[in-house]
């Protein structure tokens, strides 16, 4: 956002506390500063990740440890998320579902091959047959997915109704809206979806970083999903570059 959000221009601080209580300016003015290099990130990913999206169990566990040690929501964001989640999580068994639409359908290089809505619905039905879930929590950036799920599972589907969702092949991250603090809200909405998915008892989803984060947060709490189905259609290798 061009204006201050929660008193800051730092997008990380829109939602999170700084791990050590220092600001960016504090760090820049310190006598000794160590900066990470992109090459270090490449080495870590080659060692612990199968591809740009799929994590090894060891890598996920290491990230869960880091999350547990360093990552904290700020007071405002934590209160907002807790308040929003209480309407869905009321001691019912909840199956979380993440369906990624919009720009995933465009098939960009190094992005997951899009999961079809029919694939997701089929796996949800299988999970419902094997486990007792009273509710389905649906996290999606696609308007049509909400309509399909409500038709397939009437009275069972819950989702956040204030989420900005798209209809075409363009990422909602590039969307424009008249609502106040639109891009801050986009960040909050995906963060809230992630924490909601982490709070679910089961999970059906395709490959995505939102799902990776939910699994990391889940493990950091010392819990496991009763059922976990990650639909993996592979990664696009076609040279098509991501664009607005």
Where are these regions (language model features)?
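Catalytic "initiation/cleavage/transfer" segments centered on a nucleophilic residue
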Residues: 187
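Catalytic donor nucleotide-activated moiety binding site of glycosyltransferases and closely related
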Residues: 98-104, 125-181
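A donor-sugar binding/catalytic signature common to diverse glycosyltransferases
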Residues: 190-234
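Leloir-type glycosyltransferase catalytic cores
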Residues: 230-244
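A structural signal for short, well-ordered beta-strand segments and their strand-loop junctions
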Residues: 1, 96-98, 137-139, 158-159, ...
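An acidic- and aromatic-residue-enriched active-site/binding cleft used to recognize and process polar
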Residues: 1, 102, 141-143, 208-209, ...
């Amino acid at each position: 956002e061009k204006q201050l959000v929660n008193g800051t221009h730092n997008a990380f601080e829109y939602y999170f506390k700084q791990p050590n209580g220092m600001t960016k300016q504090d760090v820049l003015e310190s006598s000794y500063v160590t900066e990470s290099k992109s090459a270090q990130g490449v080495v870590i990913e080659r060692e612990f990740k199968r591809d740009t999206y799929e994590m090894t169990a060891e890598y996920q566990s290491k990230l869960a440890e880091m999350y547990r040690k360093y990552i904290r929501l700020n007071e405002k964001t934590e209160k907002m998320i807790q308040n929003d989640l209480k309407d869905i999580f009321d001691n019912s068994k909840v199956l979380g579902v993440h369906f990624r639409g919009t720009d995933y359908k465009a098939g960009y290089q190094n992005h997951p091959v899009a999961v079809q809505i029919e694939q997701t619905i089929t796996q949800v039905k299988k999970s419902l047959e094997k486990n007792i879930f009273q509710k389905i929590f649906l996290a999606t950036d696609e308007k049509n997915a909400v309509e399909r799920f409500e038709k397939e599972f009437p009275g069972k589907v819950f989702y956040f109704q204030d989420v900005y969702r798209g209809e075409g092949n363009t990422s909602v991250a590039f969307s424009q809206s008249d609502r106040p603090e639109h891009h801050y809200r986009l960040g909050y909405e995906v963060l809230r979806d992630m924490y909601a998915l982490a709070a679910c008892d089961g999970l059906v989803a395709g490959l995505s970083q939102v799902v990776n984060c939910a699994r990391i947060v889940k493990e950091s709490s010392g819990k496991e999903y009763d059922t976990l189905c990650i639909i993996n259609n592979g990664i696009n290798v076609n040279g098509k570059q991501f664009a607005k």
